[in-house]
Amino acid sequence: MIGYMILHDVSARDIQFKDKQFTRGKGIDTFAPCGPWITTKDEISDPQNLHITTKVNGETRQNSSSSNMVIPIRRIISSLSVTMTLEPGDIISTGTPAGVAMSMKEPKYLRDGDVVEITIERLGTIRNRIVYH
């Protein structure tokens, strides 16, 4: 593993609810944008202790830490490597902290034109405009 970067874990919930599984609703072209760069592994002493914020149109939707992840990064890599060959260049997504629209009492799903900004301590910030096709 060479390092860490931000990956915007986009989901098309309408497709996921219809299909009753997540694969197609996360695999749409343009989903999972990542960046803004790779921070090398040696620059991050504890990847399980990074502050994470997600804003939609400037409104904070997620304010958490990688310490709150359900499965630690090392365990994710170990588990995946048992069933598949991990190759240089592979990207492994750890998922997202609490605060996704689906879990809200009154869900605020992303709309055409919304701007999503994700910041992870020491990894930078990515901004993506939602465009419906």
Question: Where in this protein do the model-derived segments appear?
Answer:
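N-terminal accessory regions of nucleic-acid-interacting proteins
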Residues: M1-Y4
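Catalytic-pocket segment enriched in acidic/His residues
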Residues: R13-H133
